Amino acid sequence: MTLNEAIKDKVYEIVEIANCDEALKKRFLSFGIHEGVQCILLHYSMKKATLSVKINRIQVALRSHEAQYLVIKESV
């Protein structure tokens, strides 16, 4: 499941950053996004074009095409 498929206000864990280029991986790292991090989908725009995600007490905005590279699982 990718971050695009997440449900608002549920806690997820990022299990993989799949098939993206190095520039995007560096951008994710600059936001604190990496494998093992917990995240919560806070808001999204119409048609989920942009997503607002909480990661380590920081709110981050991601585009839909960026979120598709983040593989997540529901956190316990």
Curated annotation (Swiss-Prot):
GO terms for biological process: iron ion transport. SUPFAM superfamilies: C-terminal domain of transcriptional repressors (SSF50037). Keywords: Ion transport, Iron, Iron transport, Transport. One of its GO terms (molecular function) is transition metal ion binding. It comes from the Bacteria. Might be involved in Fe(2+) ion uptake. Belongs to the FeoA family. This is Putative Fe(2+) transport protein A. It comes from Helicobacter pylori (strain ATCC 700392 / 26695) (Campylobacter pylori).
